[in-house]
Amino acid sequence: MKVILLERLEGWGGLGDVVDVKDGYARNFLLPRQKALRANGANLKVFEAQRAEIEARNAKAKEAAGKAGEKLDGTQYVLIRQAGESGQLYGSVSGRDVADAVNAEGGKVERSMVVLDKPIKTLGMHEVKIRLHSEVAVTVTLNIARSQDEADRQARGENVIASQFEDERMAAEQAAADLLEGGAGQQASEYTEAQA
């Protein structure tokens, strides 16, 4: 189906472009959300007559998104989640979780604005892109941790999972050394008693 785009759509074109899209995409997404018009003679005339108004409305929306983006860009949000010892989350962090975290801090983000290739399933610092407008995108940082203390350590740049494994390795080495010292001393005393 040929449609006239009413705003810039990534991968499709800019305002006023006539593009050919799949029927379902046009009927279920573009037309109901008023992102496009069917490309026929009547709609082309309507679009050309209202082009200046549509461009002004789009510019105003872009400016508002830009102002909101200045406040959001580079901000950090802490999400406390349960996870295993390897740092694997019990569940995942989705676009809805990101939007909820931003909105809890006073932002205005819908989950459809959050761009995630796949859900986040590990602890740590994660960069997430939020598309506020078709031409305005910002990046926020998610600090996903098991506790606030862990989140603070991660914010300082510490790799919490690696340090946890290092602490466990050192404790195991110390326990092994203690066993060797205790075991060697006991064997020597048993040997001297047997000699006597």
UniProtKB/Swiss-Prot annotation:
It comes from Phenylobacterium zucineum (strain HLK1). Residues 186-196 have a biased composition (Polar residues). It comes from the Bacteria. The keyword Secreted does not apply. GO terms for biological process: translation. Pfam families: Ribosomal_L9_C (PF03948), Ribosomal_L9_N (PF01281). Belongs to the bacterial ribosomal protein bL9 family. GO terms for molecular function: rRNA binding; structural constituent of ribosome. Keywords: Ribonucleoprotein, Ribosomal protein, RNA-binding, rRNA-binding. Residues 174-196 are annotated as: Disordered. SUPFAM superfamilies: L9 N-domain-like (SSF55658), Ribosomal protein L9 C-domain (SSF55653). InterPro entries: Ribosomal_bL9, Ribosomal_bL9/RNase_H1_N, Ribosomal_bL9_bac/chp, Ribosomal_bL9_C, Ribosomal_bL9_C_sf, Ribosomal_bL9_N, Ribosomal_bL9_N_sf. This is Large ribosomal subunit protein bL9. Binds to the 23S rRNA.
